[in-house]
């Protein structure tokens, strides 16, 4: 191949490459459109069985938009029944294929590892993370409800082993975007 043809081929390929990369990036960005309102940094407060607490969480894309990473902490002041403590967790939201529904895996400082399926309700305001049914383990449900442009509520519920649909509220909170 002569040098002129190689240069023209290189220019053609180089000209197409940015469009291909941009197109691929836009496709990946649209993969998370249904979860987009969760993206960003949030501050919240609420309470439940562990007591009244306050904390922060964030959802940010990772691995070139292939996953969403949620980092969270909640701080609880001391009470007459227990000392002050802090709960930290990390969740990775992913899709096993481009057409699959999102799933998540959760880890926390207490040693929990929870696999969730994620349902986005038709109203596009409610997102529900529900754990697998495991015979001898509790089942968990975490629900986010968009209440405004920069506000949401969340509810974390637990169902006892053997009663996978008998959820009771463990924590309820309100959050606002930072």
Give, region by region, the residue ranges found by the protein language model:
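Bacterial N-terminal signal peptides
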Residues: 8-18
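Bacterial N-terminal signal peptides that target proteins for export
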Residues: 1-8
